[in-house]
């Protein structure tokens, strides 16, 4: 597993992550294991707003979507510490939040971290999940029930799209 950091990113990341520093054509971090690559684009709130207003953010997201299969948009910092918030430009930051919500729903997962330290923790966590083969796998825990009939309903409800009520009509 290799974590690569774009050479334009702050030296903080190179000093606090086990990584290679090199120019990356898209994204700010790449997590690679075998043929799989996860691209992480990092933005502070102010940077995200400026990029969004100049339409660069949409272009960056489009390039990542076209060229990679796994990707994340990471927004770093707190809204309250952004220049927009300090200047009481709440409408602009709300508009950006709506755009990010839409992107998260329609195009790219959006992750929020509170600081560079938190970003490093998230990247280490994501790297570990990728390395363990757990990235993009969600496993629901089963509940132990006494009735054998209820046990089958519970097992069936683990299938995506099947609720307990639906499993009762099926079995």
Placement of each model-derived feature along the sequence:
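Short hydrophobic beta-strand segments
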Residues: 1-8
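Extended, alpha-helix-rich binding/interface surfaces that flank or overlap catalytic cores
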Residues: 20-158
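Short N-terminal binding/cap micro-motifs at the start of the first secondary-structure element
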Residues: 10-15
């Amino acid at each position: 597993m290799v974590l690569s950091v774009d050479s334009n990113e702050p030296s903080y990341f190179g000093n606090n992550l086990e990584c290679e520093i090199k120019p990356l054509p898209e994204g700010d971090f790449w997590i690679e294991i075998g043929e799989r690559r996860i691209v992480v684009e990092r933005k502070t709130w102010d940077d995200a707003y400026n990029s969004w207003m100049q339409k660069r953010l949409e272009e960056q997201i489009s390039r990542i979507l076209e060229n990679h299969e796994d990707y994340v948009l990471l927004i770093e910092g707190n809204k309250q510490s952004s220049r927009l918030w300090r200047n009481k430009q709440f409408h602009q930051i709300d508009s950006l939040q709506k755009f990010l919500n839409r992107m998260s729903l329609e195009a790219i997962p959006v992750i929020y971290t509170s600081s560079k330290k938190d970003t490093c923790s998230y990247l280490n966590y994501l790297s570990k999940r990728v390395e363990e083969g757990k990235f993009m796998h969600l496993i629901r825990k089963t509940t132990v029930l006494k009735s054998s009939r209820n046990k089958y309903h519970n097992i069936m409800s683990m299938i995506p799209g099947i609720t307990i009520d639906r499993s009762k009509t099926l079995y």
